[in-house]
Amino acid sequence: MKIVDKYTYPRSSRAKLAGLRHYTVDGEEKLLPSVTTILGQTQPKEKQDSLEKWRQKVGLREAQKITRDAAIRGTAMHKYLEDLIRGQRSLDLTPLGVEATRMAEIIVDRGLNDCSEIYGIEATLYYPGLYAGSCDLIAKYKDKVSIIDFKQTNKPKQREWIEDYFLQMAAYGMAHDAVYGLSLIHI
């Protein structure tokens, strides 16, 4: 796996507007809402209700702990993978760090090892004037230019529960196509 300078991804920064994540992107005049913000704001009521039911079932304090631990684990997993791609090694010996490392190694074994070229790490993608986001990796995966986003989970998820992941990747693919003229159908 080698890093190849094939595309020039813009610099960006994140900002909150009315409590929602937006991006400032070089070359864009206005703040662009993040893909995840748009998906969160357009979530079906049933999905919002099921999350609230879960919070009530486990209790607010436990729900906050589970959410916080998942965020810590996800951040540690991403750091491990990004460092690995850049040829560095990171070691987090905290209990959540050890879990994150195990999750990251599964991603390496089941997918990252099949990436031959890396075009972008934590790359900003934006659809001019509409939205922006940051994907974890743009790489040649099994000989196809692909957008890759690392996801961590505590339990296996059913396909219908992760529809937002597919919508997020489709939005990133459309953004890449709009800016670089390359249709990415492998997400």
Report the location of each language-model feature.
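Active-site catalytic microenvironments for nucleophilic, acid-base chemistry
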Residues: D83-G87, M174-V179
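Active-site metal-coordination segments of metallo-dependent hydrolases
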Residues: Q158-F166
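Conserved small/polar residues in nucleotide/adenosyl-binding loops
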Residues: I185-I187
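Conserved catalytic cores of phosphodiester-cleaving nucleases, focusing on short active-site segments
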Residues: H78, G133-K157, A171-Y172
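Substrate-binding/catalytic groove segments of enzymes
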Residues: I147, A178-S183
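Metal-dependent nuclease catalytic cores that hydrolyze phosphodiester bonds in DNA/RNA
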Residues: M1-A132
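An active-site-proximal "capping" alpha-helix that borders the catalytic cofactor pocket
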Residues: Y165-A175
